[in-house]
Amino acid sequence: MEPETPEKVDSAQEKVRGKTPTADDSDDSREKTGIEEKGELTDAYQLQVAEEMAKEIKKKIRKKLKEQLTYFPPDTLLHDDKLASEKRKKKKKKVPVPTKPESSPSDVCDSAVEGEQKKEGTPEDSQHMEGICSREQDVDATVPENAKPKPKKTKKKTKAVSNDNEDTNGDGVHEITSRDSPVHPKCLLDDDLVMGVYIHRTDRLKSDFMISHPMVKIHVVDEHTGQYVKKDDSERPVSSYYEKDNVDYILPIMTQPYDFKKLKSRLPEWEEQVIFNENFPYLLREFEECPKVILFFEILDFLSMDEIKNNSEVQNQECGFRKIAWAFLKLLGANGNANINSKLRLQLYYPPTKPRSQLNVVEVFEWWSKCPRNRYPSTLYVTVRGLKVPDCIKPSYRSMMALQEERGTPVYCERHRETSSVDTEPGLEDSKEEVKWKRLPGQACRIPNKHLFSLNAGERGCFCLDFSHNGRILAAACASRDGYPIILYEIPSGRFMRELCGHLNIIYDLDWSKDDRYLVTSSSDGTARVWKNEINSTSTFRVLPHPSFVYTAKFHPATRELVVTGCYDSMIRIWKIDAREDAAILVRQLDVHKSFVNSICFDDEGHHMYSGDCIGVIVVWDTYVKVNDVQTSVRHWTINKEIKETEFRGVPISYLEVHPNGKRLLIHTKDSTLRIMDLRILAARKFVGAANYREKIHSTLTPCGTLLFSGSEDGIVYVWNPETGEQVAMYSDLPFKSTIRDISYHPLENMVAFCAFGQSEPILLYIYDFQVAQQEAEMLKRYSGTLPLPGIHQSEDALCTCPKLPQQGSFQIDEFVNTENSSSRKIQLVKQRLETVTEVIRSCAAKVNKNLSMTSPPPGPAKKPRVKQSFVLTTDEIIHQFGLPQTAFISIERGPFVRHVDPPPMVVALYDYTASRSDELTIHRGDIIRVYFKDNEDWWYGSVRKGQEGFFPANHVASETLYRDSPPKVKERSPPLTPKEKTKPEKPLASQKQSLSKGRPLDPRLGPQPVGHSEKGKDQNVEDRGHKVDMETKKSEPVVRKVTLIE
């Protein structure tokens, strides 16, 4: 290679020298532009800061000017605050821009000249950056926490500053667990709000055997003075209802103690709302004369009397309390926002051990201001919010807030057997209003005869319903398109109260607790749910999960903490419901039944439980419970006996209910038969009439036990007398198209509710009305001696009284029957006079039969009788001899001159019968027997000519009218009638009815006219369902004799 000549080298150096000045010039221009941009940004920022300071000064001036006019500034200032905060955010985003050229100096590090220039410019840049950073920190102090960015330098700085409040801000807030939008105190314009402090819980406290029942004491202190905050109105009670007038400051309030031993938990959960009846905006004002409020929370515990006597350190304690920890909360934060409407987590601190040095300030304030804060290893959860005071607060035995009146004592209420409206009528808004029920305590229940109103049960009807024990609420398990709600209606107004939503399928059963504060429901969605009966409570209180359908659920009568459920898996489960615990506890499972459990019931005391399954087996349990130890008592439940009757073996049991006397059990089975079983001898009485082969139907007994109601698959409600087994009434014209599923009788009123599960089926309520009963009695008097007809409605309602059954309001005929059985001597004395009267009546028979008519209603206020499947027909002479009231007999009408009544029907004995008991009557073939009443289909009560009386078989006799053509043969004991002879007397009967149906003038001298010869009597025979009435006349007898055979 050729060596380079000096000329070449010089030329190369000149080229380099020529290029170097151009590069230096470009770098210098870049530096100048960067510095100019920094200067412009700093100038703009300083200008913005000056503008903000000017605005702040203007705000202070405006506040002072408008201080006398209003407590709060106008909305324009709030708008200015929002604009200013937005501008701060924008400027903060632009501030980090100048740091970019500083972070990349690699462009200028190639030459020594550039390095020197950089060194000269560094102090100048650093001064600008320090000023910007310092101003950034000032701005960050005024920006809310949720809006300020967190650069790395700022984080390091905060960590370095905090020593004892490492995770807390200056307001005492450790963490905001439920963040709401920040609340500015200027936005709180509602003066009706008062301060409410909700104490939730703490984390686990430090293990200490001396802590057994902690509580929280809340102080409201002024930061300026260190004393309790002065009241806005000195005459207004803030902490206590009986607050003295000379107390002009806000007194502290304590929560209820949390007993670790009783509640079996070391994690205190008070969940208590403490209300300070002070104007809430007053505590949040930013004026100089207004207090700057700090809330202090002390966790305390009781000192026992032994500790107070023996412990010398008690002198340092206050009022016999052991101080465990304390916390504080500033209502107004350093960022200008209020620490309210959010669940806050406050750091707890140990109380100082040194004694108080300042007696003129609150002790907790001295801890906060003078003493070092030593962290306690736990936190406290609180929520502060403004509350609107309700217009009406129910009084209580003990006043729990400043607005609650203290009234009465438990001892007074027990002595007078009175309870507060808070206890007797939960869940009602107008519980102070007393309802006067028409049915008096101990009075017999009546059959409701008047339609009260209809209630909406949803698109698919109602499956079950039940009145509360106080009678003020009707709970109905309904079905709609969207779900299966429990609808609560107020009684007696029928007003809708609220819906309880939660079930996902059909609700089979529901039951009220003894105090009506809880309601339990069972459903085919595999759950049983417990609901609180409170005004604003619509959600589920407890859920009891099951593996399959739940058919029944009941509260134990002795305690509302126990719920018993019956499930499709043949298990009976006992659950404990505790208000302090989050979930229900399954105490025990009873696996005895071999098929799914359909129904469960208890007696009134709760000593016995009865469970029925799908194969007809009833198990009786001993279920005594000690209220103080519920779980242990449940483990001792045992089987008393099993009832396996052959009559309903294999037949599903739909419903069980204990009779009010506690000695009998109502059994509703799916064989269309109801039974009431005597639990002592296991003998049952049957009630037939209601069809039930497929559906689950609930029947019910009235609270007095004198009536039995049951629905049917034919849409009719049947009513029986449990004592006699007789059907006393039926509701035949109800508007139900589906099966009547459930019936509930009101516990304090003569009221009943019906429901059906079907498309748009309503809930019907009927009530007993005395005026309606009187109208029915007047209507039935026109039938003059006949019993109520099966198609007669009471005041266009659906209640029908069966022809063989009495009206539900009168018991006079029953008394007459009992009197007649017990006074046979009086009857024998009357017989002789009765025979003479009968002879007089027979002599006038022809005249009476010609003048019979029913064109005018009979006068007189006689009431409709009550009889037992029988006729009680006699004369006025018998009435006077027996000393009984006129209303005890059926439609006896008086004329102006002569009294005519239907005598007892006469029958003829067809066969001989010898009495086997003392109360029976011996008869011979051909004897004429006078029938007084018919006990049942097989046995009648009557007397023969000789004066002997007693019961005789009904199938041994025939009507005397069959022998009217040959009376001498009857006396000679003629042979039994042949079927041909039986049909002969019936032929003239039809023609005779036709002739008697024509209207004839009424003879005013005559008294009553027999119904058998009137148009109404004819209509009665047409409407009578399966009851045969033989009506014949005799030439020698003035009155028609009737015999009704009840099938």
Swiss-Prot record:
Residues 1-17, 29-40, 77-86, 115-138, 172-181, 963-987, 1013-1040 have a biased composition (Basic and acidic residues). One of its GO terms (biological process) is photoreceptor cell outer segment organization. Residues 902-962 form the SH3 domain. Residues 1-40, 67-181, 963-1047 are annotated as: Disordered. It is found in: Cytoplasm, Cytoskeleton, Cilium basal body; Cytoplasm, Cytoskeleton, Microtubule organizing center, Centrosome, Centriole; Cell junction, Adherens junction. The modification Phosphoserine is found at residues 853, 974. The keyword Ligase does not apply. Its main location: cytoplasm. Residues 149-159 have a biased composition (Basic residues). Pfam families: SH3_1 (PF00018), WD40 (PF00400). GO terms for cellular component: adherens junction; cell-cell junction; centriole; centrosome; ciliary basal body; cilium; cytoplasm; MKS complex. SUPFAM superfamilies: SH3-domain, WD40 repeat-like. Expressed in the retina (at protein level). Highly expressed in the brain. Highly expressed in the testis. Expressed in the kidney, thymus, heart, lung, spleen. Weakly expressed in the liver, stomach, pancreas, and embryo. Strongly expressed during periods of both cortical and cerebellar development. The keyword Lipid metabolism does not apply. Residues 96-106 have a biased composition (Low complexity). Involved in vesicle trafficking and required for ciliogenesis, formation of primary non-motile cilium, and recruitment of RAB8A to the basal body of primary cilium. Component of the tectonic-like complex, a complex localized at the transition zone of primary cilia and acting as a barrier that prevents diffusion of transmembrane proteins between the cilia and plasma membranes. Involved in neuronal differentiation. As a positive modulator of classical Wnt signaling, may play a crucial role in ciliary signaling during cerebellum embryonic development. Is targeted by provirus integrations. This deregulation contributes to tumor development. Self-associates. Part of the tectonic-like complex (also named B9 complex). Interacts with MKS1. Interacts with NPHP1; probably as heterodimers and/or AHI1(2):NPHP1(2) heterotetramers. Interacts (via SH3 domain) with the dynamin GTPase DNM2. Interacts with HAP1; probably as AHI1(2):HAP1(2) heterotetramers. Interacts with RAB8A. Interacts with CEND1. Interacts with SPATA7. This is Jouberin. It comes from Mus musculus. The gene is Ahi1.
